């Protein structure tokens, strides 16, 4: 069994607006190992995106904790969480969130710039990742000049440019057609094999989820089961 990379212990999330209290997540506990590929499957509104925000340190749980590489996030300062996100975590979203005025190469390089790497290292690593996602020939193109599938590949290259230990992906193929969605998941699997990066993908698509090594189901803010999707149609 792979060494545990990230662990959730009884995560709960509650929002309060005036006298109205909304419980979004209920006692979420699970772990993901080094280099593992896991899917969390659930319909819209089931709490999947909220969970990813907690795992990435973008939001704070009402109770419970997230432990990354043996370190409780509750013990980290805001600056330490930001450094963790820059150095150890990658994020992929349904919408690519590329900067429109920057080229593909510049978008991929952004986490390295934030991390204050040396210029030569930034350029070499960003080009290496564009090559890894098959877009080195599009390095000087802006997002408006790329197809939807190409934009998402650039977003994936950006997420992986710092060689993170874990990538959190929120419906990464939600805006793509079936052919491009299939291509993106093939790419994630290849990058997992080549770099040993762990992936946690939330999705409502069973066909895509079954490509991952483990699948958990979320309903109404609760993890309800570990799924077996080998025969999913």
UniProtKB/Swiss-Prot annotation:
It is found in: Cell inner membrane. Its main location: membrane. It comes from Salmonella choleraesuis (strain SC-B67). ATP binds at residues 42-49. Part of the ABC transporter complex LolCDE involved in the translocation of mature outer membrane-directed lipoproteins, from the inner membrane to the periplasmic chaperone, LolA. Responsible for the formation of the LolA-lipoprotein complex in an ATP-dependent manner. This is Lipoprotein-releasing system ATP-binding protein LolD. GO terms for cellular component: plasma membrane. The gene is lolD. NCBIfam families: LolD_lipo_ex, PRK11629.1.
